[in-house]
Amino acid sequence: MWWSLILLSCLLALTSAHDKPSFHPLSDDLINYINKQNTTWQAGRNFYNVDISYLKKLCGTVLGGPKLPGRVAFGEDIDLPETFDAREQWSNCPTIGQIRDQGSCGSCWAFGAVEAISDRTCIHTNGRVNVEVSAEDLLTCCGIQCGDGCNGGYPSGAWSFWTKKGLVSGGVYNSHVGCLPYTIPPCEHHVNGSRPPCTGEGDTPRCNKSCEAGYSPSYKEDKHFGYTSYSVSNSVKEIMAEIYKNGPVEGAFTVFSDFLTYKSGVYKHEAGDMMGGHAIRILGWGVENGVPYWLAANSWNLDWGDNGFFKILRGENHCGIESEIVAGIPRTDQYWGRF
């Protein structure tokens, strides 16, 4: 009897795996198929003439990795609005509206973390500390605790590193903002552009514990620390409450090739093969045409999606989006002398 059940489970799994058609990730056929489905979102071309290895490397998060301790639930104690956008709630915190570019490196796990940490540092200091926390510092200096740099990592390790070792400031590539700006250049998704071509060959830069020339204070003095870091349960209300009270969070989910074509609307997987795990920053929620969504920021530059942002189905743990939420609270006492 139990052999029959196992066989049935396998058959169902195989059937499910083939429910959705498969297309080349960069094909017009994939885009056209999605747009003919009368689904909740629209597809378009975000990438031209890039290596498939590059597309897969963009998805550099190891799903199901180490877990941080959970925080005490408080979602039932908060009256939550139907729609929320952290960019509007904390309009004095400019990093919330920023879109970064991870380049040819599987560093999404680091970007999702430093973006949310930057936002929360501003939020928890009432707008007094506006800092772009360095993805470079986290990517290159966290080590094995965070995974394998450009070859993929763990969001939980990123937040733990922030609380234990701290992170310096650092803006986007060639910005000369902060102690350690990002050293991996953006690459060209489009045919006629000035950026270098996108490949899957990016190596992890080495850890450099000194700020770029002309910047002060020193690397050690520039560190920003977290007071605590934790995981948030997959309860929709708890995730919403966390964002509403403390600011954007880092989330991770399984990317399928149709996500690469997202342009607008509420993303729901329709077609294509699995590309890998991907980390992003979730900054709000809402309802569009009756469909509940999470509002999120990607790290594939402004050319991708809806000016770098996207919406994804909320409430069904779609592609695992509600399974791996991590966050933390900044150590604000380190700034007291500055106010």
UniProtKB/Swiss-Prot annotation:
<feature type="active site">
    <location>
        <position position="108"/>
    </location>
</feature>
<dbReference type="GO" id="GO:0042470">
    <property type="term" value="C:melanosome"/>
</dbReference>
<feature type="disulfide bond">
    <location>
        <begin position="179"/>
        <end position="211"/>
    </location>
</feature>
<feature type="signal peptide">
    <location>
        <begin position="1"/>
        <end position="17"/>
    </location>
</feature>
<feature type="glycosylation site" description="N-linked (GlcNAc...) asparagine">
    <location>
        <position position="192"/>
    </location>
</feature>
<feature type="active site">
    <location>
        <position position="298"/>
    </location>
</feature>
<dbReference type="GO" id="GO:0016324">
    <property type="term" value="C:apical plasma membrane"/>
</dbReference>
<dbReference type="GO" id="GO:0046718">
    <property type="term" value="P:symbiont entry into host cell"/>
</dbReference>
<dbReference type="InterPro" id="IPR025661">
    <property type="entry name" value="Pept_asp_AS"/>
</dbReference>
<keyword id="KW-1015">Disulfide bond</keyword>
<dbReference type="Pfam" id="PF00112">
    <property type="entry name" value="Peptidase_C1"/>
</dbReference>
<feature type="propeptide" description="Activation peptide">
    <location>
        <begin position="18"/>
        <end position="79"/>
    </location>
</feature>
<dbReference type="InterPro" id="IPR013128">
    <property type="entry name" value="Peptidase_C1A"/>
</dbReference>
<keyword id="KW-0007">Acetylation</keyword>
<comment type="function">
    <text>Thiol protease which is believed to participate in intracellular degradation and turnover of proteins. Cleaves matrix extracellular phosphoglycoprotein MEPE. Involved in the solubilization of cross-linked TG/thyroglobulin in the thyroid follicle lumen. Has also been implicated in tumor invasion and metastasis.</text>
</comment>
<dbReference type="GO" id="GO:1904090">
    <property type="term" value="C:peptidase inhibitor complex"/>
</dbReference>
<dbReference type="InterPro" id="IPR025660">
    <property type="entry name" value="Pept_his_AS"/>
</dbReference>
<dbReference type="GO" id="GO:0030574">
    <property type="term" value="P:collagen catabolic process"/>
</dbReference>
<dbReference type="GO" id="GO:0004175">
    <property type="term" value="F:endopeptidase activity"/>
</dbReference>
<dbReference type="GO" id="GO:0048471">
    <property type="term" value="C:perinuclear region of cytoplasm"/>
</dbReference>
<dbReference type="InterPro" id="IPR012599">
    <property type="entry name" value="Propeptide_C1A"/>
</dbReference>
<dbReference type="GO" id="GO:0051603">
    <property type="term" value="P:proteolysis involved in protein catabolic process"/>
</dbReference>
<dbReference type="GO" id="GO:0004197">
    <property type="term" value="F:cysteine-type endopeptidase activity"/>
</dbReference>
<keyword id="KW-1003">Cell membrane</keyword>
<dbReference type="GO" id="GO:0005764">
    <property type="term" value="C:lysosome"/>
</dbReference>
<dbReference type="GO" id="GO:0062023">
    <property type="term" value="C:collagen-containing extracellular matrix"/>
</dbReference>
<keyword id="KW-0788">Thiol protease</keyword>
<dbReference type="GO" id="GO:0030855">
    <property type="term" value="P:epithelial cell differentiation"/>
</dbReference>
<dbReference type="GO" id="GO:0097067">
    <property type="term" value="P:cellular response to thyroid hormone stimulus"/>
</dbReference>
<keyword id="KW-0458">Lysosome</keyword>
<dbReference type="Pfam" id="PF08127">
    <property type="entry name" value="Propeptide_C1"/>
</dbReference>
<feature type="disulfide bond">
    <location>
        <begin position="93"/>
        <end position="122"/>
    </location>
</feature>
<keyword id="KW-0325">Glycoprotein</keyword>
<dbReference type="GO" id="GO:0005615">
    <property type="term" value="C:extracellular space"/>
</dbReference>
<comment type="subunit">
    <text>Dimer of a heavy chain and a light chain cross-linked by a disulfide bond. Interacts with SRPX2. Directly interacts with SHKBP1.</text>
</comment>
<keyword id="KW-0865">Zymogen</keyword>
<dbReference type="GO" id="GO:0046697">
    <property type="term" value="P:decidualization"/>
</dbReference>
<dbReference type="InterPro" id="IPR038765">
    <property type="entry name" value="Papain-like_cys_pep_sf"/>
</dbReference>
<feature type="disulfide bond">
    <location>
        <begin position="142"/>
        <end position="146"/>
    </location>
</feature>
<dbReference type="GO" id="GO:0009897">
    <property type="term" value="C:external side of plasma membrane"/>
</dbReference>
<comment type="similarity">
    <text>Belongs to the peptidase C1 family.</text>
</comment>
<feature type="disulfide bond">
    <location>
        <begin position="187"/>
        <end position="198"/>
    </location>
</feature>
